[in-house]
């Protein structure tokens, strides 16, 4: 496994032609960290990743970049170690979660994030949301008879979210095979719908817990 970092024309320490590696191949100095999460882990930008492989890469990089290894190194290497460790943790949190990973790929490919809004949701779901809001108001006003209706609604939205996740997995595979921006647009719309449904689930669960 070859860890990759952002390309520089030459190693900052010895001046030899730089490769896209974690350490200079000639003087073994730590190089500036890559900002791209996939490149940081030495991975191709894909929507489906092997979680075990990603975890192994994370643990290995954690050992290589730990600041304790650089206490006797140059100030620049100590700085790079801290920067790289912060990027590593952010990258791992993002790439290990399929939804966060998809959102990262969309941003990486220039797709703007779309906030979940009612105008992006089909009329059938909006009707259910209207009924949900009525039940929420009933519960908030002290009418416990609305609780079973909310539990049914929560389960329905959870099932809806699971269905969206299955559809996303299919689209992830399709994108990895084709690299199609049309597929990315379909993924973006599904993620928009998922966020909307997830917000509904969170709102219902919050009220049921009160």
Can you describe what each PLM-predicted range is?
Residues 1-210:
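C-terminal accessory/regulatory regions appended to core domains
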């Amino acid at each position: 496994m070859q860890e990759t970092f952002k390309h520089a024309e030459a190693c900052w320490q010895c001046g030899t032609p730089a490769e896209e590696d974690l350490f200079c191949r000639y003087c073994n100095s730590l190089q500036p960290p890559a900002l791209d999460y996939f490149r940081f882990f030495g991975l191709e930008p894909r929507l489906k990743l092997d979680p075990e492989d990603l975890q192994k890469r994370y643990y290995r990089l954690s050992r290589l970049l730990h600041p304790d290894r650089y206490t006797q190194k140059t100030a620049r290497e100590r700085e790079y170690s801290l920067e790289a460790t912060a990027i590593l943790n952010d990258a791992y949190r993002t790439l290990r979660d399929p939804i966060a990973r998809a959102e990262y790929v969309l941003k990486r490919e220039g797709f703007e994030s779309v906030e979940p809004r009612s105008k992006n949701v089909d009329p059938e779901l909006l009707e259910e949301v209207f009924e949900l809001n009525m039940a929420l108001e009933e519960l908030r006003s002290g009418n416990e008879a609305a609780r079973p209706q909310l539990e049914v609604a929560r389960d329905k939205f959870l099932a809806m979210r699971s269905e969206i996740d299955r559809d996303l997995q299919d689209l992830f595979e399709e994108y990895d095979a084709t690299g199609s921006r049309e597929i990315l647009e379909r993924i973006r719309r599904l993620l928009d719908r998922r966020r909307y449904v997830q917000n509904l689930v969170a709102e219902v669960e919050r009220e049921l817990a009160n």
